[in-house]
Regions:
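Subtilisin-like serine protease catalytic core
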Residues: 1-119, 133-136, 163, 178, ...
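Substrate-binding/access-modulating region of protease and related hydrolase catalytic domains
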Residues: 61-62, 69, 84, 108-207
Length: 211
């Protein structure tokens, strides 16, 4: 993606160099390596802008082509966070900036499969690898409807990420009101009624920042 093709201007200021990722692969065990035995430095390191990338949904380093996925939202959000303007964008839209932190590095962890599905094992593997890598922040623009306060075996992973010093940011969801997921149908509950259960999981967990 050309939005992520521009590398940070100060190589000494980046958190991860290619040598750093190589050292992690040599000294620690990632779920990525267990999912794809062919995982190596050259398959997960893309550039100083994207020092790590893995497709947890399909269990391989290959992300496929743009035509293979129904979920481009993560790429959109990554652009808002750390995207860089291309010369074409600058000329066509008269823009001076794109991402909020254009010098930031991106660790890309794909957790949606080609059908638009995301399962707990994808997420848990990705988050635990994020802990192993020692990332600063994790953004999750995802969630299941009417999330619980606690979900055994899942909540603990998010707690561990926060305890490791990772700022875990999760989208609150777009359900609007409880009736959206009601067994009785939307028409049985007025949208003006006081509602509950509108936050999605994992945004309901105590240890995350939900926006």
């Amino acid at each position: 993606n050309p939005t992520f093709s521009k590398e940070p201007t100060d190589p000494d200021a980046v958190a991860y160099s290619k040598d750093d990722i190589a050292a992690i692969l040599d000294s620690k065990t990632l779920h990525a390596e267990e999912l794809d035995k062919s995982t190596a430095l050259d398959t997960i390191y893309y550039s100083s802008k994207v020092p790590f990338g893995f497709n947890y949904a399909d269990g391989e380093a290959n992300f496929g082509s743009d035509d293979d996925t129904m979920m481009g939202h993560g790429t959109h959000v990554a652009g808002i966070i750390a995207g860089n303007l291309t010369e074409a964008d600058q000329e066509q839209f008269d823009m001076t900036s794109l991402g909020i932190a254009p010098e930031a590095q991106l660790v890309i962890m794909k957790v949606f499969d080609q059908g638009g599905n995301c399962y707990f094992d994808y997420l848990i593997a990705a988050i635990e690898d994020a802990i192993t890598l020692g990332v600063d922040c994790a953004n999750l623009s995802l969630g299941s409807s009417s999330g619980p306060y606690y979900y055994e075996g899942v909540t603990e992973v998010y707690d561990a990420a926060t305890a490791a010093g990772i700022s875990v940011c999760v989208s609150a969801g777009n359900d609007g009101f409880t009736g959206n997921e009601s067994l009785w149908g939307d028409e049985q509950i007025k949208s003006t009624s006081v509602s509950s259960g509108t936050l999605g999981m994992p945004g309901t967990f105590d240890s995350v920042l939900t926006v």
